[in-house]
């Protein structure tokens, strides 16, 4: 006698933390799914009657007909209204726009004669089958999966994620996935596909080798209100489902400590999201496409990398780094360029001014005019060395206008005091006001030229934003505006001397590590 195939049922599995199992009728009746309590989908783009499903237990397949307006996807086939597709066991139905995945599963039943047909969504209840029928639910509860919403950070933990002592970290866009449309930026939530076919196999190997798989992705458009967080969450769940391995996903939604290349996401992983298990930097790796590669870095790759943030993220941590092509395709390492400014090279010591032979302070009344980018260290230096020695501090940010600055300077000089002008003063015209004040009072006027470059000043401003909530952010428009307006000071303007002030790192040790991190790619 031929072997009788074990009877069973087809059911749909939601992503970790999603809806409970959805059992499909085995008698040929249609089941309509869409937005609602059965799927726990609230996406308004998903119709309440999005798809019609008819299960065939004999072939273990499901016929899928799209009823809604927006596209559903069966496996890799995108449907249209009225069109049909099919699912086999292990295939995934994306309800709408490539989101809200439901994977078809088969569950064998050992005593079918005692098991009457039950409505969709009702678990099997025979004594012999209770344990098997509850497996999907138990698996989800045990893994404690789902999303955690923190300030400026989203964290997703899929079922099956375990704490490990080594991490295989990945960027998302351009590393694990790319756009299906071929455009640089996705046209919608369903515009994605796995970047290379080699990726799923490699990820399975890493999981088998004991790596924790983690995605670190910057998504500033969420913080700016241009990308709904719930839409991106659904996309992440769909991507993780497609990759077929348990991932933890950290999403930086704003600028600051969490945004790569700053290491805040990694710090959160180590301190709060790995159950206290220490992570070995040397045994871990990070893979990303923002690697600072120049134009024509490989045959057919004409565009240079848009950023170096992924490579710098790894560099900040001391992690081994690879690009997707090097890691998944075994391409030879490509050349790359690091930013012109390296914060690790900033000195804490050295001469306060150049030339060193010049005195920093004057015993007699004078005017000192500072010149330098916002963030060049002017206020810190002047307060530490001049204001503390009795100089009157004149600053437009506190006084409100250059007219008040001039008045304050004139008043101080009439009182026989020394004055430090703490403004950017980029051109001769802005400096001439204070040269004239000194000339009218019959005292010398010196210029302190703060030599921090544009890139160093931008780094300093980002550091201030991360460490001082009272600091008003300085936009790049202001920074580049200063550079455009800048005129190098000369003695011909009326200065008695021009001293160069190199930037020195004046931060407490606990902040030194953060300052020395690359903060922009």
UniProtKB/Swiss-Prot annotation:
Location of region: Kinase: 341-516
Chain positions recorded as ATP binding sites: 372-379
N-acetylmethionine modifications at: 1
Region described as Phosphatase: 146-337
UniProt remark on domains: The FHA domain binds threonine-phosphorylated peptides from XRCC1/4, and is responsible for the recruitment of PNKP to the sites of DNA repair. The affinity is ten times greater if peptides are also phosphorylated on the serine preceeding the phosphothreonine.
Tissue/organ expression: Expressed in many tissues with highest expression in spleen and testis, and lowest expression in small intestine. Expressed in higher amount in pancreas, heart and kidney and at lower levels in brain, lung and liver.
Residues in FHA domain copies: 6-110
Assembly notes: Monomer. Interacts (via FHA domain) with XRCC4; mainly interacts with XRCC4 phosphorylated by CK2 but is also able to interact at much lower level with unphosphorylated PNKP.
Annotated protein name in UniProt: Bifunctional polynucleotide phosphatase/kinase
Bias (Basic and acidic residues) ranges: 127-137
